[in-house]
């Protein structure tokens, strides 16, 4: 028996060694290319330590940064003095042995180091593909699919609010809730399938089963709330689409230049200067906002054909936008005359019919001595005729920036309501589910609906719960989806 055990152990070890040698050790530059203060080269795989020893003579203790002299393995020339970090498997990002070299960020230093790794003489080593480090982290159980998708969003975040939302996903918030749902669904399915053999004609009406379907219904409501909440968070991921509209010479171009902190649009006292929609992405108190400056809305014989096209584009942008800013001058006569124009009035009414958030900016307060007196009747008119809340009517000066801080604060509050809608107290659905994840949730919800509709037929109900469980598994990658995995990992840059 001992001989058989020894033979089995030797065979297993030989197979394991062959398997390990089949896994390539990968390396890549993990920081952006180009000259910088520091550049990080990452090496991951079964031969990572051998590569490091070839370049530096030794490997430091795990998780202790140590200074090492990096030499070319062929020419024996010094390349750089670098900090070396060793992360022993499985306690690394990839779950494999990982060595990181923190080099000086010169182009030659990086290029020669990468060449030295390639010429180290270590077998089965190659440059990493985009996202391959993250792919290994997934397959080695170091991260689930939602955490890696969250990591993509963290890397791509351009504003603070995008970053905060992405970090919830990257740190496992979506995984945690999916784990809870999937665990409960597996329990429900087990109960239903176990009941098939003991129920008469597969019909159930006992108290325990009734309670199960009540819980299924509650779970479906929770999932539906998260689907809707995810749609709102998608606005944050892509940027909030805001159209700036109003009459000519109201200060729309001045506003977009002010918010962008650079000259985007031409500012001129001549009417009709802006002909086409001009877009710019800006950061407003952490929210990514895609601003569109549009042609002034007006009618008249002096409106040229090309300006008419610009006005049609402006109205189309109002239709597409998620929030509309209407800009008017402080002069009440000019304000009332502007509202008499059907182009402006109908656009306001369309936004109200669509229940789209609107903010009114009464601009050029620096041009009058007592703007509060002139602002009062304009605000009263908007409140009375369009039921616009007081906190969405603002007196500002794009020239002196008066009133700008209060306006941006009010605008941020509206953005907050758009991306974090109020929900039932029992359901806090404010996670950033992306489109792929929401599709999985929608499919799960559909299967739960069918299970609830067929609650009298235990066989059908059990099958639908099984399919719903698989849909939740697809969110985190617990269910195999090779084609989806490759798409997600390809979104990472080389070195991540």
Curated annotation (Swiss-Prot):
Main subcellular location: mitochondrion
Transit peptide: 1-19
Name of the encoding gene: mss1
Record key words, sorted: GTP-binding, Mitochondrion, Nucleotide-binding, Transit peptide, tRNA processing
Gene3D superfamilies according to UniProt: P-loop containing nucleotide triphosphate hydrolases, Probable tRNA modification gtpase trme, domain 1, tRNA modification GTPase MnmE domain 2
Binding residue positions for GTP: 246-253, 293-297, 363-366
Name of the protein this chain belongs to: tRNA modification GTPase mss1, mitochondrial
Alphabetical list of Pfam families matching this protein: MMR_HSR1 (PF01926), MnmE_helical (PF12631), TrmE_N (PF10396)
Role summary: GTPase involved in the 5-carboxymethylaminomethyl modification (mnm(5)s(2)U34) of the wobble uridine base in mitochondrial tRNAs.
Domain TrmE-type G, residue spans: 239-416
Family, similarity comment: Belongs to the TRAFAC class TrmE-Era-EngA-EngB-Septin-like GTPase superfamily. TrmE GTPase family.
Entry-linked SUPFAM superfamilies: P-loop containing nucleoside triphosphate hydrolases
Subcellular location: Mitochondrion
Transmembrane segments: none
GO molecular function, one term: GTPase activity
GO cellular component: cytoplasm; mitochondrial inner membrane; mitochondrion
Entry keyword Acyltransferase: no
